[in-house]
Amino acid sequence: MKSLQALFGGTFDPVHYGHLKPVETLANLIGLSRVIIMPNNVPPHRPQPEASSAQRKYMLELAIADKPLFTLDERELQRNAPSYTAQTLKAWREEQGPEAPLAFIIGQDSLLNFPTWHDYDTILDNTHLIVCRRPGYPLEMTQAQHQQWLEQHLTHTPDDLHQLPAGKIYLAETPWLNISATLIRERLEKGESCDDLLPENVLNYINQQGLYR
């Protein structure tokens, strides 16, 4: 049996402890062998990043240099068109084969918006969803048919993620750090300290490049 791999996408503008620490805990909780970090190029749902693709990639390389759990996948950065998760996960499934257990990590806030994603209903054909729970967000979807979809796929045991290739949603009890890239950018713009919010080598690079000023 192949070991469970997970993909973790985002803008990472910049990468910070709120990205890394919950996923490291998640890996220990459910037995992830590898987490692939995939930075977006042109996120369809969000404003354009302040840092360039090359700068965001380099910050990620710095952040995971001493963390063997993580690997970096640059495919979305190399696209000139918007990145759609459903397309990316379909391509990943084709690369890994039909039997490999694959998962996509999202936050609870993203789960609530999930039905608005491009071809969202095809994503569970190719991967599981692992949802990192966050305080203050409801556990129910806003529409009845979406709640039914959630309950249909929900599992309470991580074993299902290992034994099945795709199709399950698991709500993980991960620590939540009150850190966001927006907060970091605002603090840097004001000249405030961010020492405890992101890795030191990433912060040094931000200062060297004069980012988020």
Swiss-Prot record:
Arranged from A to Z, the UniProt key words for this protein are: ATP-binding, NAD, Nucleotide-binding, Nucleotidyltransferase, Pyridine nucleotide biosynthesis, Transferase
In the UniProt record, does the keyword Lyase occur? no
Identify the InterPro entries for this entry: Cyt_trans-like, NadD/NMNAT, Rossmann-like_a/b/a_fold
Per its UniProt entry, what is the enzyme's top EC class, as one word?
A: transferase
Q: Which SUPFAM superfamilies match?
A: Nucleotidylyl transferase
The UniProt family comment states: Belongs to the NadD family.
Protein name, entry field? Nicotinate-nucleotide adenylyltransferase
